[in-house]
C-alpha cells in the first residue's frame, strides 16, 4: 500500500491568496469600467475625419453611445464587405458564451432557434432591417428594442420611419458594415454602432444596461475583425490565383 503524500498547506494557502487577489482585481477593474461607462453615457465621442459616415448620419445624426472599430484588409472593398456580411458569428465559442452570460444575468433563456449562418441573414432573422445598402461599400442596419429585457425583441422599421421614430420606452440602434478603398487591392473595414433612447425612462434603463453589459457587446464587435480579415484575404488570394 502506497504512502499518502502529505498535503502542502502552505502552497494551498498561497494559491487561494492568488485566486482571491485575482478575483478582487478583476472586480475592481470591472467596477471602474462600469463607473466610467456610466459617467460617459450621453457624451459619445464624435467621429474622426476618416470615421465620418454621412450615410449613417441620415438615420441617426445624434446618439448617446457609440462603438467604432476598423481594420486594414488586403482585399478590395467588395470582397471585404461580402466576407463581413457572410461571416458566421455564431461559430465563435466566445460569442456563444457572451450570449449565454447575458441571458443568465438578465434571467432570460438562450436563443436555441435555428438561425442562418451569415451575419446579415442572422441579423435580419432577429428583426433588424437594412436601412440602406451601397453595393461593395456599406450596409446600414437598424432596429428599435428594449435591450434590458431578458429576451428582447428587435423590431425593424422601414428606412423612411426609422429616423423619426420616437415611441417612448425604446432604444434605437443603428449599425454599419463598411469597406473603404485603401489602394488598388486593399480596404479599410469599418463597423460602427450607435444608440439613443427615446425618452427619459428608457434612457435610465439603457444607461444602466450599457454601463454593466457593454463589455460583452464591444467584445463581440472586436471578435469578428480577425476572422473577417482572414476570410476576405483568403477570397482575394483565391481570386488572384484563378486569374493567373
Feature annotation, model-predicted:
Residues 18-19, 34-45, 121-185:
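Hydrophobic-ligand binding "helix-grip"
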Residues 68, 72, 212-216, 220:
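Conserved aromatic-histidine-acidic binding/catalytic patches
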Residues 90, 148-151, 197-199:
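A short local loop/turn or secondary-structure capping micro-motif enriched for an aromatic residue
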Residues 1-61, 65-66, 91, 182-188, ...:
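Short amphipathic, positively biased membrane-proximal segments
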Residues 159-216, 228:
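Beta-strand/loop substructures that line and gate deep hydrophobic ligand-binding cavities in soluble
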Residues 215-218, 222-244:
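Compositionally biased, intrinsically disordered linkers/stalks adjacent to structured regions
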Residues 85, 143-145, 193-195:
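Short, hydrophobic/aromatic-enriched beta-strand segments in well-ordered soluble domains
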Residues 34-131:
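Hydrophobic ligand-binding cavity/cleft-lining segments
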Amino acid at each position: 500500500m502506497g504512502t499518502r503524500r502529505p498535503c502542502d498547506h502552505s502552497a494551498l494557502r498561497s494559491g487561494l491568496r492568488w485566486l482571491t487577489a485575482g478575483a478582487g482585481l478583476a472586480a475592481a477593474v470591472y467596477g471602474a469600467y462600469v463607473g466610467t461607462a456610466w459617467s460617459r453615457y450621453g457624451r459619445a465621442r464624435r467621429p474622426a475625419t476618416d470615421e465620418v459616415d454621412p450615410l449613417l448620419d441620415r438615420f441617426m445624426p445624434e446618439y448617446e453611445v457609440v462603438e467604432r472599430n476598423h481594420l486594414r484588409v488586403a482585399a478590395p472593398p467588395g470582397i471585404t464587405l461580402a466576407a463581413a456580411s457572410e461571416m458566421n458569428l455564431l461559430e465563435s465559442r466566445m460569442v456563444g458564451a457572451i450570449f449565454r452570460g447575458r441571458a443568465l444575468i438578465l434571467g432570460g433563456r438562450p436563443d436555441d432557434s435555428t438561425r442562418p449562418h451569415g451575419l446579415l441573414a442572422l441579423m435580419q432573422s432577429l428583426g433588424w432591417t437594412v436601412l440602406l445598402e451601397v453595393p461593395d461599400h456599406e450596409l446600414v442596419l437598424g432596429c428599435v428594442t428594449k435591450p434590458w429585457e431578458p429576451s428582447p425583441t428587435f423590431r425593424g422599421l422601414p428606412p423612411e420611419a426609422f429616423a423619426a421614430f420616437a415611441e417612448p420606452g425604446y432604444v434605437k440602434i443603428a449599425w454599419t458594415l463598411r469597406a473603404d478603398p485603401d489602394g488598388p487591392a486593399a480596404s479599410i473595414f469599418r463597423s460602427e454602432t450607435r444608440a439613443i433612447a427615446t425618452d427619459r425612462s428608457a434612457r435610465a434603463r439603457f444607461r444602466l444596461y450599457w454601463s454593466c453589459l457593454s463589455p460583452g457587446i464591444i467584445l463581440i464587435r472586436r471578435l469578428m475583425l480577425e476572422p473577417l480579415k482572414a476570410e476576405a484575404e483568403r477570397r482575394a488570394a483565391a481570386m488572384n490565383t484563378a486569374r493567373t
